[in-house]
Curated annotation (Swiss-Prot):
Biological process per Gene Ontology, one example term: amino acid biosynthetic process
GO cellular component: cytoplasm
Gene that this polypeptide is encoded by: aroA
Chain positions recorded as 3-phosphoshikimate binding sites: 20-21, 25, 164-166, 192, 311, 338
GO MF term list: 3-phosphoshikimate 1-carboxyvinyltransferase activity
Name of the molecule in the record: 3-phosphoshikimate 1-carboxyvinyltransferase
Disulfide bonds: none
Pathway where it operates: Metabolic intermediate biosynthesis; chorismate biosynthesis
EC number of the protein: 2.5.1.19
Amino-acid biosynthesis as UniProt keyword: yes
Annotated family: Belongs to the EPSP synthase family.
SUPFAM superfamilies membership: EPT/RTPC-like (SSF55205)
Length: 429
């Protein structure tokens, strides 16, 4: 458990951890490339390590260290055992598509209790459209998932754009194996597009080209067939999702902090946290590779469309508690499909602290109360809730006890130590 007490001031220099999204994609791409790739500044978090270990089961040789992962990619082989991806939904979804391209046999992918409840049916349906064979062992669209090796025989696949972007990423990373050119057709407006931009960016670095379909009245992507993944040296940038908690702490508390390893020209959608706090009234200094914050700032509630930034919702919920007026979060139905239902979890747990939050079908309405009280909070094994609630606890009267702090190892393994280094009053017990 994590015990958090009111923190009068934070000061110091921090580095945002490496991007989880970029690390996942880079290690999988490197494993598919015949040769050696050096991945610099990888995230050594539990989810990304799940991707690395799973890639080893498909034939890659990977030397892991804190500074660099050396990946020797090769032709995909049939795993010798069930592929257990732990708690990593990204690993499960991307490798469900990729595993169809082993030379023969079957792959079985599964994970922990939480993963075995995560929806997979839209991806399974899409892959089956391509002539591949994959299914849930329970016939309910959840893991364990069985995938048969096979050739892609149909080259147009339709999928909703408002489901998890990880499904579309999986298809994007699988279709280059097709002998023919392929097309992904989105049947509904796209959500979480920045994550697909990250996928396209990483694929490009590893020699695979994806084109956005610019035809009128047709939304989707075009992928050339017979493309080869090529090895490269790749440096992974800092993670704006994880930096959002540091930004929130900086604008809400008496602070003088510098957050390094976040880039002004990043393709990450969650860089929007900088614009959000600016619109709320914070004067944040954004530079080429770092952010400087001298708080606190008087914030005002605003309306925020979270279509492309679902991972920022817990951070926004905490910011809204300390803003004048109402903060409205909308277009966030997909936020319910993360590690937990984050809309319900934020409402339930922050309300225990005295927050005034109304849960809507697609979002939240947070009325600023400017004062929270310590409470015992559940986090539902969700790393983002642990970190967001920690910031709330640093501003609350009394003691806040947060369960499940171990989950931060997924995306920000050094979160507690980093926060303590700048003066945060937190302790693991």
């Amino acid at each position: 458990m994590l015990v958090v007490k009111k923190t009068p001031k934070i000061k110091g220099i921090l580095s945002a951890p490496p991007s989880k999204s970029y690390t996942h994609r880079a290690v999988i791409c490197a494993s598919l490339a015949n040769g050696i790739s050096n991945l610099k500044n990888p995230l050594n978090g539990a989810d990304c390590l799940s991707s690395a270990h799973a890639c080893e089961m498909f034939g890659a040789e990977i030397e892991l260290s804190n500074e660099t992962w050396v990946v020797r990619g090769s032709e995909l082989k049939t795993p010798d055992n069930i592929v257990d991806i732990g708690n990593s939904g990204t690993t499960l979804r991307i490798l469900t598509g990729i595993s169809s391209q082993i030379s023969n046999g079957y792959t079985v992918l599964t994970g922990d209790d939480s993963i075995r409840k995560r929806p997979m049916q839209p991806l399974l349906d899409a892959l089956n459209q391509l002539g591949l064979t994959c299914f849930s062992t329970k016939n309910n669209g959840t893991a364990p998932i069985v995938v048969k090796s096979g050739k892609i025989s149909n080259n147009v696949v339709e999928i909703r754009g408002d489901v998890s972007s990880q499904f579309i990423t999986s298809i994007m990373m699988t279709l280059p194996f097709s002998e023919n050119d392929s097309e992904i057709v989105l049947t509904t407006p796209l959500k979480s597009e920045p994550y697909l931009n990250i996928t396209i960016d990483v694929l490009d670095k590893f020699g695979v080209k994806i084109e956005k379909n610019e035809e009128k009245n047709k939304s989707g992507y075009k992928i050339k067939g017979n493309q080869k993944y090529l090895p490269c040296d790749y440096t992974i940038e800092g993670d704006y999702s994880s930096a959002s908690y540091l930004v929130a702490a900086g604008v809400l508390l008496n602070s003088d902090i510098v957050i390094k390893n976040v880039f002004k020209d990043s393709k990450q959608g969650d860089r929007e946290i900088i614009e959000i706090v600016k619109k709320m009234g914070a004067n944040v200094e954004i530079n080429e590779d770092h952010v400087k914050i001298t708080g606190p700032y008087k914030l005002k509630g605003i309306e925020i469309d979270v279509t492309d930034i679902p991972d920022l919702v817990p951070t926004i919920a905490v910011l809204g508690c300390f803003a004048d007026g109402k903060t409205v979060v909308y277009n966030g139905e997909h936020v319910r499909l993360k590690e937990c239902d984050r809309l319900a979890a934020c409402t339930t747990e922050l309300s225990k602290m005295g927050a005034e939050i109304e849960e809507k079908k697609d979002g939240l309405i947070i009325t600023g109360v400017h004062k929270l009280n310590g409470a015992k909070l559940k986090t539902y094994h969700d790393h983002r809730l642990v970190m967001a609630f920690t910031i709330a606890g640093m501003l609350a009267d009394g003691e806040t006890i947060i369960e499940g702090e171990d989950s931060v190892k997924i995306s920000f393994p050094d979160f507690v130590d980093n926060m303590k280094s700048i003066g945060s009053n937190i302790e693991v017990i």
